[in-house]
Every structure is written in C-alpha cells, then in structure tokens.
C-alpha cells in the first residue's frame, strides 16, 4: 500500500499492534468541500472508513444518510462477502478512490435527494457477484446498509 505516495491520500498514520490508522484530506471535485477521512485497518478485517470532518449527519440535515454503516457511522464502499475488496489489494488503488466516489455521490445526494451511486438497499433481493458480472455491473460501492459488515 502506498498511501503517502498517492496524492489522493497523502496524510499521516499511526501504526499499532494489530493494525493502523490513516488520516488524509480529500475533495471529490475541485468545487467540493474538503473532507477529513480516516481509514482504520486491523489484521484480518476489512478497512473501515470514517468522515471525521465535516459531520456528514449534520450536512444531511436530518435525512437518513445513504450507504453507510451505523454504530459507528462509517462509509459503505463495496458489498461485503463478494470479494470486491481483498486484503492483498492496495488501499490507495481501491478504498481511497472508492471513498472519493462515495463523497461525489454524497454531495449530489445532498442537492438532489436521490442517491445516484448505485448499490443495494435493505430489503432488496441480494445480487450475487456472478449475477452482477453477467449483467455487466461492477460497482465498488454496492452494499447493504446495516450495523456491521
């Protein structure tokens, strides 16, 4: 992983027993606000991505946030269990750009009220990875909204 060397994710991190935390500032477009992002990675676990600033719940103005996990609030960037993300994949080439894409669609949702980033919502029939491939759909941000991955 080359988080420091990638201009999209240049920031600072903390290494600890069993994992690390990485924080960086990003903006999905030149006209967008800046976001402070934190990635937490633990051994044998999927990365967890948080927006530390600004408060996306406050930005939503009381509306339910789309495509997040709760407790604690973190971004849903891909559909767990489909192997769209694997521990051997580089965070700077997967999670970082997927986070920018999520933020792009989030800002659009703030204005339009419609989530255009794709993905799965609770209650929808689960699509398999093979089914999505057969349909030509490969979205990094597909997820089911829930408490845990």
Predicted regions and their residues:
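Charge-rich, low-complexity N-terminal segments
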Residues: 1-21
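Compact alpha/beta protein-protein interaction domains typified by the UBC
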Residues: 14-80, 89-90
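Domain-scale recognition of soluble eukaryotic interaction modules
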Residues: 53-149
């Amino acid at each position: 992983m080359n988080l420091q060397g990638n201009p999209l994710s240049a920031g600072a991190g903390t290494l600890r027993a069993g994992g690390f935390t990485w924080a960086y500032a990003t903006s999905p477009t030149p006209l967008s606000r800046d976001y402070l992002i934190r990635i937490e990675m633990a051994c044998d676990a999927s990365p967890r991505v948080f927006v530390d600033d600004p408060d996306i719940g406050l930005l939503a103005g009381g509306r339910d946030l789309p495509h997040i996990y709760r407790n604690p609030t973190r971004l849903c960037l891909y559909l767990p269990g489909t192997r769209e993300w694997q521990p051997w994949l580089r965070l700077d080439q997967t999670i970082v750009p997927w986070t920018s894409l999520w933020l792009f669609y989030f800002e659009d949702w703030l204005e339009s009220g419609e989530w255009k980033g794709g993905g799965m919502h609770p209650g929808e029939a689960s699509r398999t990875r093979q089914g999505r491939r057969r349909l030509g759909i490969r979205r990094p941000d597909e997820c089911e909204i829930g408490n845990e991955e």
